[in-house]
Amino acid sequence: MGKKAIQFGGGNIGRGFVAEFLHEAGYEVVFIDVVDKIIDALKSTPSYEVSEVSEEGEKTKTITNYRAINSKTNEEDVVKEIGTADVVTCAVGPNVLKFIAPVIAKGIDARTASKPVAVIACENAIGATDTLRGFIEQHTDKDRLSSMSERARFANSAIDRIVPNQPPNAGLNVRIEKFYEWTVEQTPFGEFGHPDIPAIHWVDDLKPYIERKLFTVNTGHATTAYYGHVRGKKMIADALADAEIRKIVHNVLEQTAMLITTKHEITEQEQNEYVDTIVKRMSNPFLEDNVERVGRAPLRKLSRNERFIGPASQLAEKGLPFDALLGSIEMALRFQNVPGDEESAELAKILKEMSADEATGKLTGLEKSHPLYKPVQNVVAKVQKDSK
């Protein structure tokens, strides 16, 4: 029997990043989703195209050998598929992990194969697979928990690839940047060895890769989006073509670089080269990457361990400068009532109805005693004053 991977999430990242590389590694991919439109399209279309965009032009790959199941109406089928799968991946968004966990728990529990299934969450969040595992354990009988490692092994991952807004009539086809990084920890697989997926860079310690990615790519991308939004820019490339915004982004990434190089075995030169690569990628006009797409979900992006508060809090604890990140936080707070983004409306409501003190605690999760708390509270108060 051939290799089989279960991919939760049939969206752009699921189809245009995860499934692309699973397909290239020789896996049959079974997409799981609850959106009828996506499942119906995948069922009725035997192939779709992934176009990798770079300055050299576009390279198109054809993806085949997949199936699709709606977990909302066919849960038993999903359980059976997980029962005989080699790999389970997901790209659903960190907030959705708790909703996919029950069916994955049932699927893992039903396994009888001698080799455990590899579970890898592909989300923009630190320790997403650990989070998913926690939810899965909540839906597993207590007397089965001690033997779960015989049925499943869980590995955290760091993913990095820009997927811009897609053309309106793209269907299942995905336009995506050529550059990618998919780094996964290999130690959880032990004597079984990790799955054979050539696109993955397997490492013993993932934390430096996750923090470097989140605090460089995500921090830089979101900083560009929020400053761009406030200054009326439509595209990320347009925002970075503005010399002032470009300088601000570099200043922010200089501060996060200070954290990354002091915490991890990454040299200043390595980090500087990484920053240059990231800014060049984001400046690519061929991606047609929209400022509002990158800025959406500001509540999540302002939360405690995310791209702004995460690095700024650690810098503050170490007595290192974080003022440039305060600017990013301010611009994120100004991303209010953006059409199609519920979190931006909720953000506006919080800032309108709460005091600066209450809003700071709710939005950032910072303790009042934290050295970052007061500076952020001042920024919150400033934005509230300007909004009146």
Swiss-Prot record:
GO terms for biological process: mannitol catabolic process. Belongs to the mannitol dehydrogenase family. This is Mannitol-1-phosphate 5-dehydrogenase. It catalyses: D-mannitol 1-phosphate + NAD(+) = beta-D-fructose 6-phosphate + NADH + H(+). The keyword ATP-binding does not apply. Catalyzes the NAD(H)-dependent interconversion of D-fructose 6-phosphate and D-mannitol 1-phosphate in the mannitol metabolic pathway. The lineage of its organism: Eukaryota, Fungi, Dikarya, Ascomycota, Pezizomycotina. It is an enzyme of class 1 (oxidoreductase). PANTHER family: ALTRONATE OXIDOREDUCTASE-RELATED, MANNITOL-1-PHOSPHATE 5-DEHYDROGENASE. The keyword Transmembrane does not apply. Pfam families: Mannitol_dh, Mannitol_dh_C. One of its GO terms (molecular function) is mannitol-1-phosphate 5-dehydrogenase activity. NAD(+) binds at residues 5-16. One of its GO terms (cellular component) is cytosol.
